[in-house]
Amino acid sequence: MLDIQLLRKDLDGVAKRLADRGYTLDVAAFSALEAERRAIQTHTEELQARRNSLSKQIGAMKGKGEDTSAVMAEVSGIGDDMKASEAKLGEIQARLSDLMLGMPNVAHESVPVGKDEADNVEVRRWGTPRQFDFEVKDHVDVGTPLGLDFETGAKLAGARFTMLRGPIARLHRALAQFMIDTHTQQHGYTETYTPYIVNPEILYGTGQLPKFADDMFRVEKGGAENTVTQYLISTSEISLTNTVRESIVDGAALPIKLTAHSPCFRSEAGSYGRDTRGMIRQHQFDKVEMVQVVAPETSYAALDEMVGHAEAILQKLGLPYRVITLCTGDMGFSAAKTFDLEVWLPAQNTYREISSCSNTEAFQARRMQARFRNAQGKPELVHTLNGSGLAVGRTLVAVLENYQNADGSVTVPEVLRPYMGGMERIDAPAQTS
């Protein structure tokens, strides 16, 4: 959530910055609500001051033995007026809050202004795409003989679900374990196991609600009169980041660095017809997530560090990639700045997103009321960052395509072999007649 004081001081400036993100701020509606709030708040304060004055007057009158009934009647009437005024003020503040909850974060000044992914800016590349001396297959054609089973996945759960079997399932697990081990042993993160189902207020904290309700899988339990609504997580960023909600952390405890391997569930409501083949866009997929909770002055150094942690995974796997700075129109709702990592997929002859690392600054912290005690001992909002380290399914796709061989086998990257019992390559099972 944006700082409402920022809007009160520079409404037109904030509206311009939000317009760069493709969001139209209803300046007139906000101004009208603010004017009404100020008027009611002023009236409430005047009533409070009048009641306080009359209360003192009653005390003085009683000391003199004078009749206070008329003044007490006025005080009683003021009390009724104050209750009505406070109720109206609460209603206005709730409407302001709803408006604020729908506003995205403002972009950091270093973010390129643009409309969509065409305006993103490439920062650097690593690795040279492999030159094949045979016809390259995509991950579906490579993986199906090795244990990718899209047919059974669809039969069990519908489109955009996949079954993994045998060595492909083991390779998928090996990737996740390798990522977690690297982040915990080399990058300083604490491994965390989180709930996969969370309460609605948790999603408000990290910004998925109210705007992206249609992208979430909702779980309801109980009868018609006592229904409890919860949601499957779309990323473990949600549960990891909310571990500091409604708390004041000792400044000496920062930075807090957490990582988790979890399934992620997304309805992909706006993705009809996109990436319908294979594992690129699934309703259920695994991801290793990185989250950092830091002091404001260190958050952009932490963002660079986090990008480096995601890059390290790709480099150790020997997968060519590029780093992209997202423009204002392509960033996620909560982000102030985002770097995407895109891995090379030879069958598509292009780079595809495999990690997204974002600094949300105080946007999520304000929604969660997550604070730390600064050097002066005063509570201050933390900054929160999140990043994929990496999306496991897409990393599997990249390994299958980049490490495929002419005979249909797949070479196991060296760093994964200890997790695969020393296996150097995955071969299709022999056909039986």
UniProtKB/Swiss-Prot annotation:
EC top class named in words: ligase
Residues engaged in binding L-serine: 235-237, 289, 388
Residues binding ATP, per UniProt: 266-268, 353-356
GO terms of molecular function: ATP binding; serine-tRNA ligase activity
GO cellular component terms listed in the entry, alphabetical order: cytoplasm
Principal subcellular localisation of the protein: cytoplasm
Entry keywords, A to Z: Aminoacyl-tRNA synthetase, ATP-binding, Cytoplasm, Ligase, Nucleotide-binding, Protein biosynthesis
Keyword Cytoplasm: yes
Catalytic activity field: tRNA(Ser) + L-serine + ATP = L-seryl-tRNA(Ser) + AMP + diphosphate + H(+); tRNA(Sec) + L-serine + ATP = L-seryl-tRNA(Sec) + AMP + diphosphate + H(+)
The protein's assembly and partners: Homodimer. The tRNA molecule binds across the dimer.
Family membership noted in the UniProt record: Belongs to the class-II aminoacyl-tRNA synthetase family. Type-1 seryl-tRNA synthetase subfamily.
PANTHER family for the chain: SERINE--TRNA LIGASE, SERYL-TRNA SYNTHETASE
Task of the protein: Catalyzes the attachment of serine to tRNA(Ser). Is also able to aminoacylate tRNA(Sec) with serine, to form the misacylated tRNA L-seryl-tRNA(Sec), which will be further converted into selenocysteinyl-tRNA(Sec).
Name this polypeptide is given: Serine--tRNA ligase
Gene responsible for this protein: serS
